[in-house]
Amino acid sequence: MEKLYWDMYRLTVMDFGGVAHKAIAGIDTALWDIKAKALGVPLYELFGGPLRDKVRLYWSHCGTYRAWFPDHLAGNPPSLRTMEDIANLGREVVSRGFTALKTNMVVPGEPARVIWATEGNSLNIDHDILEAVERLISTFRQAVGDKVDICLDLNFNFKTEGFIRIAKAVEPYNLMWLEIDTYDPQALLQIKQSTSVPICSAETLFTSKGYKPFFELHAMDVAMVDVPWNGFTESRRIAALADIYEIPISPHNYYSHLSTLMSAHLCASVPNIRIMEIDVDSVPWKDDIITEPLDIKDGYLNIPNRPGLGADLNEKEIAKHPWHMGRKIETAPQRAR
């Protein structure tokens, strides 16, 4: 397996990252799945057996998809018209057994929207955005109580100064982490050193070589690792490198259940796992395109012990849902109000 990975890597080394490495990642992970199934063992057994049989989950994009795709989600969840609707969503998280959530800069209204840097000077922070973010996080905190963890994902939406101002604004709410995307290790370190809020980053990085400059500076408290982008071989290598620097990892997992299974086996096979991402709000047919259901109980995913990743794709169901260019996401480039 290692030889096959490096054969593919050498063929694409002049086109590092991007679509080339994503293709390698898919092939690499599929090969691990094939080998484990051929041997009749779960994938994690190829690395000496599981370190854990379940992993704690956080409800990701909590409120985000209800703002973006209110007409396309399973169960027709309530709209987010007011801050009370945000509070009710927080209480729903608790009632469904989750002990952690992650949200974006959701602004309730008719329609609800998500603050996103899409045009002009929208990478700049202002008082309206700060007020909207603080109101959102305060409402979630009051709704879920002190024992449920909250994460806020800011993506690439600001420059360093804006990230620092938001970090300062949310310090009173005891976040599990503030999630920030950047390709500048020094800028991320500056943000980390400016706040008491733990910083999570790196979901868009490729290979251990891409992570190394960030780890050397201890520029983040938690490293996000995307298994579908990096592949199983390289994701384990990134986890091992992070462990050398005493940094826990969290799989970046907002895709399908197939990605969830990939991430689950990574969690089973490396020691330094903080928590795992999962999307709860999704399309009604998400469960149908895989042959085995996920086993989620009390906010934990029980890692499957079936051969390989633990399931296969249902090709017939997938064929029922061809991809079409969808409507433009309303991301609210205008200022929050």
Task: Explain the meaning of each model-derived region.
Residues 54-191:
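Metal-dependent enolase-superfamily TIM-barrel catalytic cores that perform enediolate-based chemistry
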Residues 309-337:
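Extended hydrophobic packing segments that form well-structured cores
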Residues 24, 28, 32-33, 44, ...:
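Predominant activation on well-ordered alpha-helical scaffold segments within soluble catalytic domains
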Residues 42, 56, 149, 198, ...:
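Proline-centered loop/turn at the N-terminus of a beta-strand
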Residues 1-39:
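Metal- or metallocofactor-binding catalytic centers and their adjacent structured scaffolds
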Residues 3, 14, 168, 174, ...:
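Shared catalytic-loop signature of beta/alpha-barrel
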Residues 27, 40, 101, 153, ...:
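Conserved, mostly hydrophobic/aromatic
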Residues 8, 41-55, 301:
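N-terminal amphipathic alpha-helix/helix-capping segment at the start of soluble metabolic enzymes
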